[in-house]
Amino acid sequence: MTEAIFEPVIGRYLRLDLLGEPHRLYIEEAGQGIPLLCLHTAGSDSRQYRALLNDAELLKEYRVIAFDLPWHGKTSPPPGWQNREYKLTSQAYTDIIMTVCEALGLDQPVVMGCSIGGRIVLHLALEHASHFRAIIGLQSGAHVEPYYDLQWLHRPDVQGGETCAGIVSGLVGPAAPDDGRWETLWHYMQGGPGIFKGDLHFYTVDGDIRDRVAEINTELCPVYLLSGDYDYSCTADDTRALGRLIKGTEITIMPGVGHFPMSEDPDGFLQYLWPVLEKIRHAEARP
């Protein structure tokens, strides 16, 4: 008989008001030490950070925290959702993150986000630098032009989950292990109707920060950018261009890695992430 083992991850619901409405926000966390707040990609949820939440060495030094945005994963939309269209905006996204940080009492956390999470951390570095120990952007770009018709993501004559997964399937790196590849796609197959499309409103329209990123001061809040080079949504050149605009940014390009480094190949990703986390850990915290 196989031994049953509990993971160290604790999942709970946090009741709080977000954007003026009551929510039950689903949060998972594990470990102790410096808070590391992890933000999932568009149309997915915090399960993308499962491997980080279970990495024994990481948990010795960092309190890893991941939550499902409203309308995503185990966080249900607010009452009356059936009468509205979901569209994520930069202001709403920022307000949600800052409210969660305050509710959890996080003292100078590191915040790490991928894709839309990699975009919003740039907004945080610009507008709330003093609140964060460091910013880590995965697949971060200042803007992206839509490269397919977003209407296909929410149509009554198209199977939404399989369409979303099909669209992002080409963004997974070719060397990703099969289990990581298919778990990443499964999360997309389970997304609510119209949620991926609504997130991409922020990613392609509202979250455009090209004209402002040069104002980010990395002396106030260090910025680290890690990008896989197998990604046509945020190319390595996009990340390099972003780094040229933000003085003092440190960039790591991950060969063969796609758009979802933390879930498609977590073991490979941790080899690139660890040096960054060690540098952050040994840096003196700002008063």
Residue ranges and their predicted role:
Residues 146-147, 160-218:
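Conserved alpha/beta-hydrolase catalytic His-Asp/Glu region
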Residues 20, 65-112, 271:
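Active-site loop/oxyanion-hole signature of alpha/beta-hydrolase fold enzymes
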Residues 219, 225-227:
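Short beta-strand/loop motif that positions the catalytic acidic residue
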Residues 122-127, 131-163:
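Flexible "cap/lid" loop of the alpha/beta hydrolase fold
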Residues 229-234:
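Acidic catalytic loop of the alpha/beta-hydrolase fold
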